[in-house]
Amino acid sequence: MGMVSEFKQFAIRGNVIDLAVGVVIGAAFGKIVTALVEKIIMPPIGWAIGNVDFSRLAWVLKPAGVDATGKDIPAVAIGYGDFINTVVQFVIIAFAIFLLVKLINRVTNRKPDAPKGPSEEVLLLREIRDSLKNDTLKSG
């Protein structure tokens, strides 16, 4: 079997296609969550705290400056505001995935309905069997 035909077999399998669709949807969902956190959730929280822009929060370890030759030296800072935004994004994505997995588990783990009892055909067959037994016992 050639490599091309093996690759076709591999790529056509349902799991690979499902995985590819999941990756594309996940990437799009990540962008939606990023926009939700950065543009909708964090601005009101920042406003409530006192007009704080979380994306600009940082601990400055060394401020920006100019060296002896006049060259700009950038600041050295730990941007914890971006970290807070990322943590909020993670929590939202993790919660959404939790809900999705819970829904999938509920659908796939449904217990089949309990049998309602024997069908009419089974009852009829039982009557025939019992009748044949009785006839055999009477004649024997």
From Swiss-Prot:
InterPro entries associated with the record: Mechanosensitive_channel_CS, MS_channel, MSC/AndL, MscL_channel
Keyword presence, Transit peptide: no
GO MF term list: mechanosensitive monoatomic ion channel activity
Domain of life from the UniProt record: Bacteria
Compartment(s): Cell inner membrane
Membrane topology summary: Multi-pass membrane protein
Signal peptide span: none
Keyword Transport: yes
Annotated keywords: Cell inner membrane, Cell membrane, Ion channel, Ion transport, Membrane, Transmembrane, Transmembrane helix, Transport
Any one GO cellular component localisation term in the record: plasma membrane
Transmembrane spans: 16-36, 84-104
Function: Channel that opens in response to stretch forces in the membrane lipid bilayer. May participate in the regulation of osmotic pressure changes within the cell.
NCBIfam families registered for this protein in UniProt: mscL, PRK00567.1-4
Assembly and interaction partners: Homopentamer.
Recorded family membership: Belongs to the MscL family.
Name recorded for this polypeptide: Large-conductance mechanosensitive channel
Lineage summary: Bacteria, Pseudomonadati, Pseudomonadota, Gammaproteobacteria, Lysobacterales
